[in-house]
Regions:
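Bacterial signal peptide processing site
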Residues: 19-21
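A small/polar (G/S/T-enriched), proline-flanked helix-loop surface module common
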Residues: 44-175
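C-terminal motif of bacterial Sec signal peptides marking the signal peptidase cleavage site
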Residues: 14-17
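Solvent-exposed, polar/charged alpha-helical surfaces in well-ordered, non-transmembrane soluble domains
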Residues: 38, 111-118, 205-209, 213
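Post-signal peptide N-terminal segment of mature Sec-exported envelope proteins
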Residues: 27-43
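A short, solvent-exposed beta-edge/loop patch
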Residues: 137-219
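Sec-exported extracytoplasmic/periplasmic mature domains
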Residues: 35, 45, 106-108, 125, ...
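N-terminal export and membrane-targeting signals
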Residues: 1-7
Length: 220
């Protein structure tokens, strides 16, 4: 599955003229870098993420207990205009794969992600009657994505009731970040389990690596 994903998604948007390749690259709308229908591997479907949904596709509406633990993608999107943001959900129901692919120009700070991993290994998010205990650990970036950053969050869900705080379940989110010639690429895998399956992470890695390759080829 991972191989077919990477091959299927490695197509490029053509840009002509070597002398003006950079300026032409910068004129390509970020939504053009999303996965086209014809690039979807068998069994996958896609649906757009628009407007405020882009923010909710990251950490939702819960707020962190410490300011430095604001999910890094929030910072990336806060400095980009709406025209320079795009996203889509890529789903493979047979393997319970749901990946949010988000693009933003300009890309944000990768060092901010390093600080997040270092400083926010354990913290709390709260909001809408929910309490999320978050544990953060590094995650290995896929091959052929030099300079990328990655981490995995294990999230213990609980809610408030008349009898106090009730523990619900533990889920996970895995994040991949890349800066590809100024275009920020963020891929997020949600799993209903404490740890994603090998097939789920293989799909995430292939989607991210394929997107990095697609944008790099467009650049020239």
């Amino acid at each position: 599955l991972a191989l077919s994903l990477s091959l299927s998604m490695a197509g490029a948007v053509g840009v002509s003229g070597c002398s003006t390749s950079e300026s032409r690259f910068e004129s390509v709308p970020v939504q053009d870098f999303l996965v086209a229908e014809k690039e979807l591997p068998q069994g996958f479907s896609s649906s757009p993420i628009r407007g405020n949904e882009l923010s909710r596709a990251t950490e939702g509406t819960q707020q962190p207990s410490r300011a430095e633990c604001r999910e890094p993608s929030k910072q990336w999107f806060s400095v980009a205009s709406a025209d320079n943001q795009a996203g889509e959900y890529l789903e493979y129901p047979a393997a319970e794969v749901v990946v949010a692919l988000l693009l933003v120009r300009p890309a944000g700070s990768l060092t901010h992600i390093d600080r997040y991993i270092d400083l926010c290994q354990h913290y709390i998010r709260q909001g809408s009657g929910l309490t999320l205990g978050v544990s953060v650990k590094p995650y290995s970036v896929p091959d052929k994505t030099p300079g990328a950053r990655a981490y995995q969050e294990r999230i213990a869900l609980s809610h408030n009731s008349a009898h106090g705080t009730v523990q619900d379940s533990t889920v996970s989110s895995t994040y991949l970040y890349g800066n590809v010639h100024g275009v920020g690429v963020i891929a997020i895998l949600r799993s209903r389990k404490a740890l994603p399956t090998a097939q789920q992470t293989a799909s995430l890695n292939a989607i991210f690596a394929g997107q990095v390759e697609k944008i790099s080829r467009t650049y020239g």
